[in-house]
């Protein structure tokens, strides 16, 4: 899948494919130490103040040491939890089971996601040295390219440039998986080509009028008129936040 490294303002400067660089492998980008990495899907809102909600896919690395403000996975009183490292008191002696390296939000309104991971072999599970409470949450072997890219010929990946969507926890340097084949709809999160520039916004229709909606009060909403050249370049199928780069 091609990678547009110049970013989408939240644009990249031109729709030309000249801005596409080499293809990107999400497994290589998001999983640095495969034998020490596990992936799970959040069953509830684990850390909403950091934008980690139910159904998010979370990638943890067991081989790296946590740094200040890293999000860590730990268990306490028989419960699996996430917390910022160093942000809470009373964590002395708590067993840390992994550092969050990436989080993935899938746009389930746009795509039917049929996720069938391969089972981990017993020896692979034992190498992770995890308690049962964590083991039972692991998805198994997953190919992030297959999970996140349903239509490879029509999909590209780009990086967010700016903070106009930070109210939805979509921030500067986050990755976007964008599918040009998906149909747009009221309320969709889309990469829009407006009057010669790209921008990332929600597309809302109110009384027959189209609006491009930011998620930051510092940015105005944009009313689309007949004189505007607006094209929906693609629908955001997933947003990837790299907690460790």
Language model regions located:
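Short, positionally conserved secondary-structure boundary motifs
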Residues: 1-48, 53-54, 64-68, 75-166, ...
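Structural motif
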Residues: 55-56, 70, 173-174, 188
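Hydrophobic beta-strand signal
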Residues: 59, 73, 177-178, 191
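Short acidic low-complexity segments
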Residues: 60-66, 178-184
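Surface loops and adjacent helix of pleckstrin homology
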Residues: 63, 85-86, 170, 181, ...
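Structured core of small recognition/catalytic domains
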Residues: 160, 166, 171-179
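A general secondary-structure boundary signal
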Residues: 187, 209-214
């Amino acid at each position: 899948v091609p990678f547009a490294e110049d970013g989408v303002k939240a644009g990249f400067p031109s729709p030309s494919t000249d801005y596409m660089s080499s293809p990107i492998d999400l497994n290589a980008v998001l999983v640095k130490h495969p034998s020490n990495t596990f992936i799970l899907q959040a069953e509830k809102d684990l850390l909403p103040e950091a934008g980690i909600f139910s159904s998010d896919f979370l990638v943890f690395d067991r081989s790296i040491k946590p740094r200040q403000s890293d999000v860590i996975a730990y268990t306490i009183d028989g419960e699996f939890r996430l917390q910022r490292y160093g942000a809470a008191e009373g964590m002395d002696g708590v067993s840390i089971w992994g550092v969050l390296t990436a989080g993935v939000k899938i746009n389930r309104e746009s795509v039917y996601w049929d996720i069938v991971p391969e089972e981990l072999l017993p020896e692979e599970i034992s190498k992770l040295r995890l308690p049962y409470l964590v083991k039972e949450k692991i998805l198994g072997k997953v190919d992030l390219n297959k999970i996140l890219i349903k239509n490879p010929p029509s999909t590209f990946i780009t990086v967010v440039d700016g903070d106009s969507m930070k109210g939805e926890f979509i921030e500067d340097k986050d990755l976007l998986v964008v599918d040009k084949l998906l149909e747009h709809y009221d309320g969709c999160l889309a990469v829009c080509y407006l009057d010669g520039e790209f921008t990332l916004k929600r597309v809302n229709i109110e009384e027959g009028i189209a609006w491009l909606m930011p998620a930051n009060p510092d940015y105005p909403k944009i009313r689309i008129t007949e004189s505007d050249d607006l094209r929906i370049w693609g629908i955001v199928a997933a947003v990837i936040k790299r907690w460790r780069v």
